[in-house]
């Protein structure tokens, strides 16, 4: 081969090598261009999606804000209506309270006028006729004396109250009261003539009898002795004399087989040991009833209780015993004691003082005070009073 041919061959080989090398480079560039296009498309898609999402979110937020604004507007409207309703109710209450306050002021003015009238009357009584108070005091004391006399039968306290009433009339130094004072003196004299009863003493005696009940001795039917209580002959203790002892015992038995006793009075009934306790307690209870009847002035109850005590003691206890005799004597004396007093039915001075109170004190209080008007304020018109406020507010 020539040198020219060799050179041509080298050139062809070089071209082939260059062509072979340029083909991968073009392929690589084409692949890079495709990747860039894909990435651009993805970026554009992402941007479009983000824009669409952002637009939708903004639109939803706008819708939510619109709904919230509408709800707030509705609430505000409701609050305004409620406020207006409460305002109207408060205005009604204020008007009602104002009317009530006005009426209360009118009533207060009326009461103030009445109080002024009373004060003027009191000033008139205390200034012009101060002695009238002494007359009222005497009238009260006489009425209290009558209450003590007829309710409590306390003659001593009633007489003391009448003396105090007479002293009050004496302090008035009024000659026109001589008749009343004379009546009070007569009432005191009539009370002094009343025979008083020692109620406390009677009650103490009844209590003493109650304490002596346990000392009473029960009646014994065999207290007069029995033929079996004493033997005419004593038995021997010797065994050898058994025949004689047997004969004596038989003789005593035959002598006492039939016994005849003579009694001039009725037999006293015997009590069992457990019944004795009940009898004593019954006697104490009747004595207590009699003691309670004394301050109550229950004459029939008092005498009936003591009669029961006397009957039971005479029936079941030994009347020959000294303690029983003293007990019965005290019961008989107390049963004859009068526990009610012969009191006057009326007090002469009471009616006289009542008449004086009518003419002097009560007529003076009934007179209108000077400087006061008889005109009374007109009642408040009903139209000024609004309807009552609801109770639930």
Swiss-Prot record:
UniProt keyword list: Cell inner membrane, Cell membrane, Membrane, Transmembrane, Transmembrane helix
Coiled coil: none
Localization of this protein: Cell inner membrane
Transmembrane segments: 37-57
GO cellular component, one term: plasma membrane
Topology of the protein relative to the lipid bilayer: Single-pass membrane protein
Pfam families: HemX
Name of protein: Protein HemX
Protein species of origin: Escherichia coli (strain K12)
Higher taxonomy: Bacteria, Pseudomonadati, Pseudomonadota, Gammaproteobacteria, Enterobacterales
Gene name in the database record: hemX
């Amino acid at each position: 081969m020539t040198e020219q041919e060799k050179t041509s061959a080298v050139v062809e080989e070089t071209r082939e090598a260059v062509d072979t090398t340029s083909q991968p480079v073009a392929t690589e560039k084409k692949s890079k261009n495709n990747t860039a296009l894909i990435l651009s498309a993805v970026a554009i898609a992402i941007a479009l999606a983000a824009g669409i999402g952002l637009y939708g979110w903004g639109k939803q937020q706008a819708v939510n804000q619109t709904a919230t604004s509408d709800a707030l507007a509705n609430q505000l409207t409701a609050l305004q209506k409620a406020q207006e309703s409460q305002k109207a109710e408060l205005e009604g209450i204020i008007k009602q309270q104002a009317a009530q306050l006005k009426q209360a002021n009118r009533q207060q003015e009326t009461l103030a006028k009445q109080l002024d009238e009373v004060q003027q009357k009191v000033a008139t009584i205390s200034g012009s006729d101060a002695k009238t108070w002494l007359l009222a005091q005497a009238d009260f004391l006489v009425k209290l004396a009558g209450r003590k006399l007829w309710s409590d039968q306390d003659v001593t306290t009633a007489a003391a109250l009448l003396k105090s009433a007479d002293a009050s009339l004496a302090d008035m130094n009024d000659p026109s009261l001589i008749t009343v004072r004379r009546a009070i003196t007569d009432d005191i004299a009539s009370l002094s003539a009343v025979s008083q009863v020692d109620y406390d003493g009677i009650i103490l005696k009844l209590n003493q009898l109650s304490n002596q009940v346990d000392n009473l001795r029960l009646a014994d039917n065999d207290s007069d002795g029995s033929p079996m209580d004493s033997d005419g002959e004593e038995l021997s203790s010797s065994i050898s004399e058994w025949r004689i002892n047997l004969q004596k015992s038989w003789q005593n038995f035959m002598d006492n087989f039939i016994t005849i006793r003579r009694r001039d009075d009725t037999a006293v009934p015997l009590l069992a040991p457990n019944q004795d306790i009940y009898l004593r307690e019954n006697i104490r209870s009747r004595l207590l009833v009699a003691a309670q009847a004394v301050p109550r002035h229950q004459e029939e109850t008092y005498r009936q209780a003591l009669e029961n005590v006397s009957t039971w003691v005479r029936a079941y206890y030994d009347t020959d015993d000294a303690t029983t005799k003293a007990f019965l004597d005290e019961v008989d004396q107390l049963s004859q004691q009068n526990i009610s007093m012969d009191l006057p039915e009326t007090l002469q001075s009471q009616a006289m003082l009542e008449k004086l109170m009518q003419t002097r004190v009560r007529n003076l209080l009934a007179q209108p005070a000077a400087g006061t008007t008889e005109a009374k304020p007109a009642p408040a018109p009903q139209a000024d009073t609004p309807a009552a406020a609801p109770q639930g507010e």
